[in-house]
C-alpha cells in the first residue's frame, strides 16, 4: 500500500473522526457495480486503449485499490457476497440463479435468511434504491428495505437494447432505451427524489454493462462510442491462441468485432458514472456522498488464451485476472487520494462500508464473516492486512498469498495448480507436484482445507456433499445439482473467418 505522509495522516485523523449514528449526519452511499468487468479494461488500471475519463478522475481524486479480487467468477454468487460478506459455501449461491427462481410461482429470494447491507442500512435510517441488475431471485418485488426498485426479470442481456425490464412495479416487454443509460437515468431519478430528504440514501446502481458475454459480442456496438472504436485495433487485448481449457466463448476469441464491442460498453459505463458524479456536484451532495465503483467479478480478454471468466473453462479456472476487479472509493474531503496495494476481496466490502459510515456495531456476527474492514485504509491510516485470499467456484477452490497460489479441484478431481506469483504473475508455469515444491504445496493445501473447515456451512459445502441454491455448472451425473450440458454454437461462427483479425 502507498503510505500517506505523516502530515496527511494527522490531518485526516483530526477531521475524519467518523460519522454520527444520527441519520442526517451519515453520508449517502452510492454502490456502482458492473457486470463481468476486469480492472485491466480501465485507463486508471493501465489500459491505454479504452476511454474511461470519469473513472480515471474518480480514481485520481479517491482511493484506488490495485489488488481487489473477487472470491467467485460468476454474477449471482459475487453479488450475494457483496451484500452479505459471506463466501458461496456460506450463503449457498454457487452459480448464477436460474430463471424460474427469478420470476413466476417458484421464484424466491436467495438471501432471505441473512442480514444484508441494504437491510442494515434501512434499519439505520437510510432510504434504499435499486437501479439495475438484481439476479438474486424473486425479481418482481423489492427486498431488504429497498423502497425504489427498477430492475429486470432476468440476469443477463442479449443485446443491451430492447430487454424486458421491471419499472414502477410493472413488467415491460422491452426497455425504452440502451440499458446502461436506463439504469443511469433511474439512478439519477432516485437521487433527485431524495436529495432534500431528512434521511441519507443508499443507491445500488447495478449496470448490465460492460457484460462482455452472449451473442451481443458478435454484433458491432451501437452506443455513443461505436464510431470511436470502429477502426481501433485495441492491442491491450492479447491475440493469444485459445487455451485448451477454454470451453465456451471461442467464437469471441480474437474476434475484432467482439473486442471493439467490449471497449465501447466499458466506455458507455464510464459515461454513466460521469453523469452520477455530475448530478451529485450539481446538487451539492458530492461531499456528503461516498461513491464506490467495482465489478462483480473479473474478466479476461485474451490473456493466457482465456476469454471470459472462470466458469467458461473446463475445468473451472481460478486465474487472478478472472478475479481482479476495479475498486475505487470517492468521497471528497473525507477519503484521501491514493492507491492501496492491500489484497482485498468482496468479502471485505460489507464490513468496510458499515465501519466507514459509523455502523460497525451492525456488522453481522453470524454466520462469521471471513472478511475484514478496510475502512482504516479509506481514512488514510496504515494497517496490517491479511495476505491470504480464498476463492471458490463449485468444485474448484484456491488460496493465494503475496507469493504463492494453490488451486485444487474435486468432483471431478484435478488438475491441481501451484504458481510462484513473484516470478510468474501471469500463472504460466504450473509447479504442482513438481520436485522441490512439495513443502509449499502441502502448506498451501492445508491452509485451504483449514479455511473452509472453519467457515463453510455443511449444507452448502460442495466439497463435502453440500448443495447449491443455483444449478451447478459442472456436477457429477449422479448429483442432484447435475444438469445436461447445452450445445455450444461455436462452429458456425468460427468458420466465418472474415470477422476475425489478428
Residue ranges, per PLM feature:
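Substrate-binding rim/cap in mid-to-C-terminal beta-strand-loop elements of soluble/periplasmic
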Residues: 83, 155-172, 246-253, 274-278, ...
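Long, internal low-complexity/basic segments
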Residues: 21-27, 34, 39, 64, ...
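Formylglycine-dependent
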Residues: 93-123, 135-263
Amino acid at each position: 500500500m502507498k503510505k500517506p505522509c505523516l502530515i496527511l495522516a494527522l490531518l485526516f485523523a483530526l477531521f475524519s473522526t467518523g460519522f454520527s449514528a444520527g441519520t442526517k449526519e451519515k453520508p449517502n452511499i452510492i454502490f456502482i457495480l458492473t457486470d463481468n468487468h476486469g480492472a485491466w479494461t480501465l485507463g486508471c488500471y493501465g489500459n491505454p486503449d479504452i476511454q474511461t475519463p470519469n473513472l480515471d478522475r474518480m480514481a485520481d481524486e479517491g482511493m484506488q485499490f490495485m489488488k481487489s479480487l473477487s472470491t467467485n467468477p460468476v454474477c449471482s454468487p459475487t453479488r450475494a457476497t457483496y451484500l452479505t460478506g459471506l463466501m458461496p459455501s456460506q450463503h449457498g449461491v454457487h452459480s448464477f440463479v436460474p430463471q424460474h427462481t427469478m420470476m413466476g410461482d417458484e421464484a424466491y429470494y436467495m438471501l432471505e435468511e441473512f442480514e444484508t447491507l441494504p437491510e442494515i442500512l434501512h434499519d439505520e435510517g437510510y432510504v434504499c434504491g435499486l437501479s439495475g441488475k438484481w439476479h438474486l431471485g424473486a425479481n418482481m418485488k423489492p427486498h431488504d428495505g429497498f423502497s425504489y426498485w427498477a430492475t429486470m426479470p432476468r440476469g443477463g442481456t442479449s443485446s443491451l437494447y430492447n430487454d424486458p425490464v421491471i419499472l414502477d412495479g410493472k413488467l415491460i416487454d422491452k426497455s425504452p432505451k440502451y440499458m446502461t443509460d436506463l439504469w443511469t437515468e433511474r439512478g439519477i431519478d432516485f437521487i433527485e427524489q431524495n436529495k432534500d430528504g431528512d434521511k441519507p440514501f443508499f443507491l445500488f446502481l447495478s449496470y448490465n454493462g460492460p457484460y462482455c458475454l452472449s451473442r451481443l459480442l458478435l454484433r458491432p456496438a451501437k452506443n455513443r462510442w461505436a464510431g470511436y472504436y470502429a477502426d481501433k485495433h485495441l492491442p491491450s487485448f492479447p491475440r493469444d491462441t485459445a487455451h485448451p481449457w477454454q470451453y465456451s466463448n471461442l467464437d469471441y476469441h480474437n474476434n475484432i468485432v467482439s473486442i471493439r464491442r467490449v471497449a465501447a460498453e466499458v466506455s458507455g459505463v464510464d459515461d454513466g458514472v460521469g453523469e452520477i458524479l455530475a448530478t451529485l456536484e450539481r446538487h451539492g451532495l458530492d461531499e456528503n456522498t461516498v461513491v464506490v465503483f467495482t465489478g462483480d467479478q473479473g474478466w479476461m480478454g485474451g490473456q493466457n488464451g482465456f476469454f471470459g471468466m472462470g466458469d467458461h473453462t473446463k475445468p473451472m479456472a481460478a486465474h487472478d485476472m478472472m478475479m481482479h476487479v476495479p475498486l475505487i472509493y470517492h468521497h471528497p474531503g473525507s477519503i484521501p487520494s491514493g492507491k492501496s496495494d492491500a489484497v482485498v476481496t468482496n468479502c471485505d466490502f460489507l464490513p468496510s462500508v458499515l465501519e466507514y459510515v459509523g455502523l460497525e456495531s451492525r456488522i453481522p456476527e453470524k454466520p462469521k464473516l471471513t472478511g475484514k474492514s478496510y475502512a482504516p485504509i479509506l481514512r488514510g491510516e496504515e494497517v496490517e492486512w491479511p495476505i491470504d485470499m480464498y476463492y471458490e467456484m463449485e468444485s474448484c477452490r484456491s488460496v493465494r498469498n503475496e507469493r504463492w497460489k494453490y488451486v485444487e479441484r474435486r468432483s471431478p478431481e484435478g488438475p491441481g495448480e501451484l504458481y510462484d506469483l513473484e516470478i510468474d504473475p501471469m500463472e504460466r508455469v504450473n509447479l504442482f507436484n513438481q520436485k522441490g515444491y512439495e513443502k509449499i504445496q502441502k502448506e498451501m493445501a492445508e491452509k485451504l482445507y483449514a479455511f473452509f473447515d472453519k467457515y463453510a456451512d455443511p449444507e452448502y459445502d460442495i466439497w463435502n456433499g453440500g448443495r447449491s441454491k443455483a444449478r451447478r455448472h459442472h456436477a457429477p451425473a449422479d448429483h442432484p445439482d447435475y444438469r445436461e450440458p447445452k450445445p455450444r454454437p461455436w462452429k458456425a461462427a468460427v468458420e466465418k473467418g472474415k470477422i476475425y483479425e489478428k
